[in-house]
């Protein structure tokens, strides 16, 4: 199981939002590439990055920062936020991104996912309040069901689902283990969990999660790392221990 340390970029800064609220932002640094390099040096096998400005507007104004991360680190980079067209995805791939995460556009235009999946690594990012999927930087609820949407992409050729429980994001109060178990039971596509991780025990609960013989591909952690609840190296060790037991 892989750790995906998170770098959320807004106005060129490394930030975290609380429950996806743009008015509840904490700034942790002004150099995303430096932060990514620090994560990689501690043993992160991937970096997860979100362009918060693009998630809201679709304008990839942080593309230069993302390209700088890709150039700086020697590990794969997974990036989401505002990927709503073929050209937007291609700009990220051209910038050195390994895997693009399509969220709002996947929900509103599923054919885009099917068009892009043969061209490069694509993950579908599904962000939900409970089972109600939200889009446009989490600011609009769609009324679409999380599990029905996951099932609808079963034959789309995607590399992964990135599933975020918005109510837990940035809270450090623990992941939605039961909900994630249901996700695992719904799809054979690899699943990356996001939202709520605040302790090493939370990570252990995810390592031990299994449904229909499937386990999580990875977990995204952000605030817990920035608030020094644990280090990247500690988290990687816990996830590796779990994989070996």
Where are these regions (language model features)?
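Conserved anion-binding
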Residues: 15, 19-23, 97-169
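Charged helix-capping and loop-helix junction motifs
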Residues: 60-67, 139-148, 173-182
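Glycine-rich, proline-tolerant flexible connector loops at the mouths of alpha/beta enzymes
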Residues: 46-62, 104, 163-172
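Structural preference for beta-strand elements that scaffold enzyme active sites
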Residues: 2-6, 46, 74-78, 98-101, ...
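C-terminal helical cap(s) of enzyme catalytic domains, especially alpha/beta-barrels
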Residues: 111-117, 122, 207-218, 224-245
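Conserved, mostly hydrophobic/aromatic
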Residues: 8, 39, 47, 79, ...
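Catalytic cores of alpha/beta
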Residues: 72-99, 111, 178-215, 230-235
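N-terminal active-site wall of soluble small-molecule enzyme domains
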Residues: 41, 48-95
């Amino acid at each position: 199981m892989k750790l995906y340390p998170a770098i959320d970029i807004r106005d060129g800064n490394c930030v975290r939002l609380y429950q996806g609220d743009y008015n509840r932002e904490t700034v942790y640094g002004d150099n995303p590439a430096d932060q990514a390099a620090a994560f990689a040096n501690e043993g992160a096998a991937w970096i997860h990055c979100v362009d918060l400005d693009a998630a809201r507007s679709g304008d990839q104004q942080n593309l230069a920062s993302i390209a700088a991360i890709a150039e700086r680190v020697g590990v794969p980079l997974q990036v989401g936020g505002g990927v709503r067209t073929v050209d937007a995805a291609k700009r990220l791939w051209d910038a050195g991104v390994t895997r693009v995460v399509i969220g709002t556009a996947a929900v509103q235009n599923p054919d885009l996912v099917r068009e892009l999946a043969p061209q490069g690594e694509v993950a579908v990012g599904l962000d939900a309040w409970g089972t109600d999927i939200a889009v446009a930087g989490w600011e609009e609820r769609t009324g679409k069901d999380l599990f029905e949407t996951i099932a609808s992409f079963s034959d789309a050729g995607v590399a992964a689902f990135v599933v975020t429980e918005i109510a837990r994001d940035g809270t450090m109060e623990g992941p939605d283990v039961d909900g994630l178990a249901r996700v695992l039971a719904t799809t054979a596509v690899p699943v990356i969990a996001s939202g709520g991780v605040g302790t090493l025990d939370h990570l252990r609960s995810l390592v031990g999660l299994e449904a229909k013989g499937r386990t999580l591909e990875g977990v995204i952690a952000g605030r817990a790392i920035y608030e020094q609840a644990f280090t990247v190296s500690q988290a990687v060790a816990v996830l590796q221990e779990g994989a070996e037991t």
